[in-house]
Amino acid sequence: MWLRKFLAGALFVSVLSFGGSVDAKKFPPPILTAEFEQMDFAPLYPTYSWTPLPLTQFYQVQVVKVGASQDKIVRELFNDEGFDRMTDWAPFTEAGEYFWQVRVVDRGKRPLSDWSAKKFFTVTAPVTFAVLGDSISHGGAAYIPAGQLSCQWETFCDVPIKNLARSGDTTQQMLDRFDADVLPFRPQVLVIMAGVNDVRLGASGDAVIKNLAALRDKCLANDITPVFCTITSMNPELIRQRGIDLTDGDWREARERVNLWIMRTPYFVDVAAELTDDCGYLRAELTPDGLHPALRGKMIIGKRVAEYLKANFANRT
């Protein structure tokens, strides 16, 4: 008897693992963990997250734009990053109110649960302050998805700032998406935290400076004040332990060259100094992977940016 029960349980787990179909009401709805509704502004590229249910692997995210007379489905996504999160790589630039919900599905995208409770967020424009950046500004880590408050430095910046960052971006990619992603929000001040991916992958300091100068020129042409942040350092030992790509070239020289240029611009925040150890590397106690500052590091960045904005743009904070 016990053997039959064991084999039946093993078969049930196997069916779920390989996407087999079971009753749509087999699982309870997922509990959502992203916290967009508690942020000053919804991120341009939201990362939806939820608490994964045992014996499940696949999830569907649906995003709906709330209409005056009729709601409209604007996203139907299926997770490919992990069991508990999914980043939306299509930017939310259209103002309005939205809600999102999640349900369990099988490999064939057939529902295995009801929809979760709805969570709402609002897209507004124009904004006074915004940040253009990469994963350090987008938020998130291996252990905490980007949509949670504790994994974004913007949470610790007590000046409300719109998050226009996108994980993985180089300065060229930010330049390429500037018109589509920045201009709809018409920020008065744009914080630019960019360049770490460039130097990590071997770009020269001059190449990064060229792109930053182009970003500056785009800002000025659109009556936006650019505020550059110094490029944070990296910890090569931790980076290699985590299997993250890192150039064999002299990334420190490139980073220092770019930071010297940044510190000669009219408006800049030195967020890197406090995060750097005596050897010039990102402090090991502030990073889980050698590239991304963890909670304490994000608190430092958020505090420094807020102090700078309040000191230099007091009439706008």
Would you name each region that the model predicts?
Residues 92-108:
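Beta-strand-rich modules
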Residues 236-272:
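Substrate-gating cap/lid alpha-helix
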Residues 100, 174, 266-267, 283-317:
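Histidine-centered active-site loop/cap adjacent to the catalytic His
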Residues 20-47:
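Short, compositionally biased P/S/T/A/G/V-rich stretches that sit at domain boundaries
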Residues 44-56:
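Conserved aromatic anchor
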Residues 107-167, 172, 177-186:
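Serine-esterase "nucleophile elbow" of acetyl-processing enzymes
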Residues 82-95:
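Signal that preferentially marks extracellular ectodomain short beta-strand elements
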Residues 53-70:
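Solvent-exposed loop/turn segments flanking beta-strands in beta-repeat/beta-sandwich domains
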